[in-house]
Regions:
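Active-site loop-to-helix "anion-binding N-cap" substructures in soluble metabolic enzymes
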Residues: 18, 23, 36, 62, ...
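Residue-level signal for inorganic ion chemistry
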Residues: 16, 20, 58, 145, ...
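Active-site regions of enzymes building and remodeling cell-envelope glycoconjugates
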Residues: 29-41, 152, 171-174, 290-293
Length: 342
């Protein structure tokens, strides 16, 4: 009892619900305290609806069936719930780590709320897992992660003119994929008189974003004439690394990227991080892991290569309630435009 009270006071806990044990907390501590003889009593009498924006630790012996508390809280407001198993993510991460050298860095892509897992919680988890870099799509996502005290380097894929200052305010590293974006960032850096680390994207054949071959000389000229831009990495993205039908094209992308990296780095006299492999590339083109690899959907157990080399665990479980079950006769139709037919 005393040991438990000491832990509670040390961890700045705001509320304690005790079930099946007698616990006397000093009312002067300001901790909200309630006590129940059984899980069933707690379910009947506690007002779970008042729990909002809270981090809840459920701990106890299996005999108390605390999973009933979890299920009840999960279903209070949302009848559809996406559960994320962080143990599975950890095991998937370790599976990929076995495929790369100890010296190879890992950039975890946590865009779109970490594919539904929650970008802040995922970032905190990956920080504990000793990930080297995070990548997000938007500055807003990066700011949320920074606000949760993550100190990991964060690359931002897409930046806008109206939020450039946030790059310096939150120590973020933008992807630079065109001369226009480069000039905007450089102009802002010069106005602030503050250096910024950036990631140069080369278009090796995906033809979405990135510097084309004829733009590289101007890129080198601009970077060579400023002290305000630090090239943290040079990278590219493979179009179809998961599909062996396109292996020749993938190899041509890698070969072009190697040449572009050499041209840029040697011209500038720098040695930035070099990376081109995405999740599928780690499995199928392992010899090109270079300085860093980028992991996305693979962390959640999705392997687009369908490789037999690795065994991943699905980290997401989507749970929903069935609203209604009907019995209808053969040849009857269902839904809009009568699209379903029995």
């Amino acid at each position: 009892g005393d040991k438990l009270k000491e832990l509670i006071s040390q961890k700045a806990i705001l509320e304690v619900i005790a079930i099946g044990i007698k616990l006397n907390l000093d009312t002067e501590t300001g901790i909200k305290f309630s006590q129940y003889q059984s899980t069933a009593e707690c379910l009947r009498e506690y007002d779970f609806a008042q729990l909002k924006d809270s981090c809840i630790l459920i701990k106890g012996a299996r005999s108390f069936a605390f999973e009933r508390l979890f299920n009840h809280m999960s279903l209070q407001f949302h009848q559809t719930v996406l559960e994320t198993n962080f143990n599975s993510i950890s095991r998937n991460l370790n599976t990929y780590r076995k495929l790369i050298k100890p010296s190879t860095k890992i950039m975890a892509v946590v865009k779109a709320e970490a594919y539904g897992s929650g970008s802040v919680k995922m970032a905190q988890f990956l920080d504990d897992q000793k990930i080297d870099y995070l990548a997000v799509a938007l500055i807003d996502e990066a700011i949320k992660i920074r606000a949760a005290n993550s100190q990991l380097p964060i690359m931002v894929f897409n930046i806008q003119d109206n939020n450039l200052k946030a790059l310096w305010d939150y120590n973020l590293e933008p992807e630079i994929y065109s001369l226009t974006v480069l000039k905007r960032v450089l102009s802002y850096a010069e106005n602030l008189q503050k250096k910024i680390a950036v990631h140069i994207k080369v278009d090796s054949g995906m033809h979405r974003l990135g510097f084309m071959p004829d733009e590289v000389p101007e890129l080198i000229r601009i970077l060579g004439n400023t002290d305000f831009i630090q090239v943290a990495s040079i990278f590219s993205h493979l179009s179809a690394s998961e599909d062996e039908v396109h292996d020749d094209y993938t190899i041509s992308q890698i070969n072009y990227f190697n040449a572009a990296y050499k041209q840029i780095s040697e011209s500038l006299g720098v040695n930035p991080i070099k990376h081109i492999l995405n999740t599928a590339g780690v499995i199928r083109f392992n010899e090109h892991q270079y300085d860093m690899v980028r992991l996305g959907l693979g962390l959640y157990g999705i392997d687009e290569t369908n490789s037999k080399k690795i065994q991943l665990e699905k980290a997401h479980t989507l749970k929903a309630r069935v609203l209604q079950i009907k019995k209808i006769e053969r040849d009857q139709t269902t839904g809009y435009s009568r699209a379903g037919r029995v």
